[in-house]
Amino acid sequence: MDKVCLIGGLRSYIGLTGGVYRHVPAELLGAAVLKAVTEKYNVVPQQIICGNGVGAGGNIARLAALEAGLPESIPAVSVDVQCGSGLEAVAMAAAKIEAGEADVIIAGGFESTSTQPRRGYNANHPDYKGEETYSVAKFMPGIHRETVMLEGAELTAEREHISRAESDPWVLRSHKLAAQAAADGALSDIIVSCFGAVRDEGIRPKMSQRLLDRLPCVLEGGRFTNAANACLTNDGAAFVLLASEGYAKAHNLAVQAKVRHSAAAGGDPLVSPKSAILALNALLQRAGLSHTQIDCFELNEAFAVIDVLFSRAFPGHEDGYNVFGGALAYGHPYGASGAIILLHLLKSLQKRGGRFGAASVAAAGGVGTALLIERC
């Protein structure tokens, strides 16, 4: 891709489930950040593409766009690749601009686990037990022996021989870097405060090895996955502005980076964390680059096993990896996370003076999504 410019973007503070955004529906949280992006850059996008992971409504992107006060003439598309939805939304937007189908698009995503919908069964469903039969909507229900993300992390640790001793330093590192970034205001220019939020609620500045040693496995019969090496569930929103070179020049928009390539990869759903590495490999192959040519990496560390897998597959990148900490500290608002890590990646490149940056997300079901940018 030579024509796709990354102008910038914004994210909300990231709230805990039941935290500061506990009464805020997903579309309103998304709308607040979406509106802030249009105002910051003084643009009216030609399309909105939004990721959302837990099905907050039919074409929730359209609802968020209308709630943000955007003209009815602007179409909006919702994307569901579970945890990778926000990054896939950006990849889709870049492809549309590269193909000449649009000149300016806002893409990203949002999530409210606090107001996560509940699913009701009708009389034709085998689980129907009367009018009061409800369950929380969940990732990939029913596939592959009901394996969910926690079990996927546990199985990954078992198959890849990852110990808590190997993963604990990554947990400590994530909270330390995130706490330092918050104290320094390193990300303040990409954060918009809304609905009374004043901080990222998941960061624990006092996280310690002593605390980690006391945490039991959260799975019956398990040995690895605990409340610290698995990410929090969260509420949040993030969007980026993409434009063609011609549009950016005509509207005097400063270009911060170019979107160069995107890639997706599928793997074993039972060990879904590995899909982030599969997607990175596919991205590097498509770009014709070695991992040694990438200055900064940003992975959505939903589990510490992802950090360990990355360090084994791409050694020597600790200084340029998740420079401001990752999801083990900030948390993981599913549909927003891809856009969040892209914004953090851009800030990392600027801080370190790097050229190429790669972002990757592993998603429920064993699908990975990755994106390559080049700082201008």
Where are these regions (language model features)?
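Buried hydrophobic positions in well-ordered alpha/beta secondary-structure cores of metabolic enzymes
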Residues: I7, P45-I48, G86, A93, ...
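N-terminal extracellular/periplasmic Venus flytrap/periplasmic-binding protein-like
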Residues: R11, H23-A32, E166-A250, E318-G320
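Active-site pocket-shaping loop/turn-to-helix segments
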Residues: R11-T38, V54-G55, V77-A91, D103, ...
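Conserved beta-ketoacyl condensing-enzyme motif
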Residues: R22-G84, E88-I97, A102-V104, F110-K129, ...
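Phosphate/pyrophosphate-binding loops at sites that engage ATP/ADP/AMP, CoA/4′-phosphopantetheine
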Residues: K35-Q46, T156, E160-H161, A248-V255, ...
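Conserved catalytic cysteine-centered active-site region
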Residues: N52-A102, I143-V148, K206-L232, A313-I340, ...
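Active-site-proximal alpha-helical scaffold in enzymes
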Residues: V81-E111, A157-L187, V240-G246, P333-G354, ...
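Active-site pocket-lining segment
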Residues: R260-A329
